[in-house]
Amino acid sequence: MRKRAATIGTLVAVLAAPGLAAEAPAEGTHYAQRTEYRAPSAAMAPVVDGIADESVWDKAAWQPINVRWLGPEYTPEDFAGRFKVVWTPERIYLLTEIVDDVLIDTHRDPLVQYWDDDTLEIFIDEDYSGGEHRFSHNAFAYHFSLDNRAIDLGTDEKPGDYTHHVQSAWKQYGDKLLWEVAIDIYADDYVDGAPDNAPVRLEAGKVMGFMVAYCDNDGSELRENFIGSEIVLSGPKDRGYIDAGLFGSLTLDEQQ
């Protein structure tokens, strides 16, 4: 991340506002008690089809989505989630297993209230630098809708469609969804609308910022729950779209 000091200074100012107090990031970049995720490499890329029958998925460990950021207590029948990650030099691949008893996608415009439908959210910080990213590409917060679009805020401070960064597919099996996603990884010099943006080529040993969440709505005007994979010790619990210091670390492991 470029200009880290200025970025963190801005973030501290935002979180110092009344009602938004939060602990300072450890060592200026990340908060305490972050999860250390690991992703095995895939000799052959999984097919993104919601079936997940490739043997490479057996090498990856499940990680829970079980931290309630917003909303009331929920039952395991209402929501349960877990995920695993693998990688190739071109992309990372995420397999998510979701229990959601009611699926909602009521906002037909993909750029309007996309967080209030059932949404898989994947947070990525290419260089694990932390800091603010709400209207920059220091990190990405991809909101995956049930129609497999990926939305994030752009540098113009408006929602943008980043579906060209990803592949997404899900299938329903009884009370569960298997949701597979492939994501190109971009550095913080990404420029919206530029024709020459190129994904980062991935290598073993690379460490990125990473976090997963799910917005659950069972029929209300607004989402009813927001559940993530990282704890938030203080301050607003739903600020992952602003603060990459909340992300865990994702290390890309050598092929076994």
Predicted regions and their residues:
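Bacterial N-terminal signal peptides
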Residues: 9-18
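Structural preference for beta-rich elements and adjacent junctions enriched in aromatics
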Residues: 21-256
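Bacterial N-terminal signal peptides that target proteins for export
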Residues: 1-9
